[in-house]
């Protein structure tokens, strides 16, 4: 299981790199769960990250505007992102989600082999977004590479407050059945890593647990916390 760490700036990115993260995921929590950062930040993080380490960029908690989102995907791509994550926030159902993702996939795959991630929300019902269990099918039918879940509302509730391990295992299995990788995030802590590993999750996304004090908003990512998480994952 790969460790994805989500820094908000170059200082945190360096901590993630030095701590041994597999994927450095540039985001901007000030703009939402999967808030987008600026192209120049993504570019600088790519420049400072070793070539054998992947850089991911979130496009935001996106609206149902396929043109806008596909153009944003190109921005992430030319900034150097290897993973391009789309938070399907404003897409209310399968059809809208596939429409957005198909256009993102076309924009990206016409230019590169970057990995496209369809990201839904375990608490989708709180924001009117497409249901989480639809995400593997959305990803597969649009030609994306990876199906992901996070939480939309960051109010202390975790992924596990909305989906139990049986449901999460079904999500991972559905992704695998479609030939996709899976990723899970949403206030994931150390205690969750082994259960997620056991259900076959491919990527785990973390910010809070890698921060000093464990707070995704007021804390800062520290290499020691990242290293401890990576060592724990490697022990499974």
Swiss-Prot record:
Span of the signal peptide: none
Species in which this protein is naturally found: Methanothermobacter thermautotrophicus (strain ATCC 29096 / DSM 1053 / JCM 10044 / NBRC 100330 / Delta H)
Function according to Swiss-Prot or TrEMBL: Catalyzes the formation of 4-(hydroxymethyl)-2-furancarboxaldehyde phosphate (4-HFC-P) from two molecules of glyceraldehyde-3-P (GA-3-P).
InterPro entries: 4HFCP_synth, 4HFCP_synth_arc
Pfam families for the chain: 4HFCP_synth
Keywords on record: Lyase, Schiff base
Protein name (database record): (5-formylfuran-3-yl)methyl phosphate synthase
HAMAP family xref list: MfnB
Catalytic activity: 2 D-glyceraldehyde 3-phosphate = 4-(hydroxymethyl)-2-furancarboxaldehyde phosphate + phosphate + 2 H2O
This enzyme's EC code(s): 4.2.3.153
Gene giving rise to this polypeptide: mfnB
One of the protein's GO biological processes: methanofuran biosynthetic process
Lineage: Archaea, Methanobacteriati, Methanobacteriota, Methanomada group, Methanobacteria
GO molecular function: carbon-carbon lyase activity
Family: Belongs to the MfnB family.
Keyword Acetylation: no
Enzyme class: lyase
Active-site residues (renumbered): 27, 85
Pathway as given in its UniProt record: Cofactor biosynthesis; methanofuran biosynthesis
């Amino acid at each position: 299981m790969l460790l994805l760490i989500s820094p908000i700036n170059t200082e945190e990115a360096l901590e993630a790199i030095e701590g041994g993260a597999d994927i450095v995921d540039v985001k901007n929590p000030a703009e939402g769960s999967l808030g987008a950062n600026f192209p120049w930040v993504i570019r600088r993080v790519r420049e400072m990250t070793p070539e054998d380490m992947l850089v991911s960029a979130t496009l935001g908690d996106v609206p149902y505007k396929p043109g806008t989102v596909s153009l944003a995907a190109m921005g992430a791509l030319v900034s150097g992102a290897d993973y391009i994550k789309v938070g399907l926030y404003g897409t209310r159902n399968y059809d809208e989600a596939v429409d957005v993702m198909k256009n993102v996939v076309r924009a990206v795959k016409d230019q590169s082999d970057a990995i496209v991630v369809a990201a839904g929300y375990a608490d989708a019902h709180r924001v009117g977004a497409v249901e989480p269990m639809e995400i593997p099918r959305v990803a597969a039918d649009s030609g994306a590479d990876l199906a992901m879940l996070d939480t939309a509302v960051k109010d202390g509730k975790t992924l596990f407050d909305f989906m139990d391990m049986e449901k999460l295992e079904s999500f991972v299995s559905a992704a695998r059945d479609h030939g996709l990788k899976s990723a899970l995030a949403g206030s994931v802590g150390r205690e969750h890593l082994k259960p997620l590993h056991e259900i076959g999750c491919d990527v785990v996304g973390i910010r809070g647990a890698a921060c000093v004090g464990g707070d995704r908003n007021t804390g800062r990512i520290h290499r020691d916390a990242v290293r401890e998480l990576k060592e724990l994952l490697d022990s499974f």
